[in-house]
Regions:
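C-terminal extensions
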Residues: 1-2, 6-85
């Protein structure tokens, strides 16, 4: 997969995402959320790498709008999973 090195591939496999088809079904935001919940280290660069892999482009070629969209999706997942106080 484009943008996906050994470390990210290993992190994906740890959460059951074994190939590009699995990643496309899961989506980049949910995949990073799953990695985060599994104790992995996620960051915006990884999120964009995952989105680029889904679109089969280098993550540097994502538009600002595409980056903002997946970032917002990821932040919503984090917010929804935060304990209510």
């Amino acid at each position: 997969m484009i943008n996906i090195g050994e470390v990210i591939q290993w992190e994906l496999e740890q959460v059951g995402i074994m190939n590009l088809e699995d990643l496309k079904k899961t989506g980049s935001a949910r995949a990073l959320f799953m990695i985060h919940n599994n104790g992995g280290n996620g960051c915006l660069s990884m999120l964009y790498a995952l989105e680029g892999a889904i679109k089969e482009i280098r993550w540097h070629d994502l538009t600002r709008e595409e980056k903002d969209k997946v970032k917002n999706e990821y932040e919503e997942l984090l917010k929804d999973s935060a304990p209510n106080m």
